[in-house]
UniProtKB/Swiss-Prot annotation:
Compositional bias per record (Polar residues), positions renumbered to this chain: 8-20
GO terms under cellular component: endospore-forming forespore
UniProt KW keywords: Sporulation
Gene name linked to the record: sspO
Stated family: Belongs to the SspO family.
Name this protein carries in UniProt: Small, acid-soluble spore protein O
Induction statement: Expressed only in the forespore compartment of sporulating cells.
Length: 49
């Protein structure tokens, strides 16, 4: 069969598709630095704190 790309991702949104990014959550801001308040409430990093 071979590997298939996941159907639930939005094409062009993220190169690493279907890798737990939350399907388009916050990818457009991935390169910007977060403020202190955003860093406290960052959904991607909350499990690592």
């Amino acid at each position: 069969m071979g590997k298939r790309k996941a159907n639930h991702t939005i094409s062009g949104m993220n190169a690493a598709s279907a890798q737990g990014q939350g399907a388009g959550y916050n990818e457009e801001f991935a390169n910007e630095n977060l403020t202190a308040a955003e860093r406290q409430n960052n959904k991607k990093r909350k499990k690592n704190q």
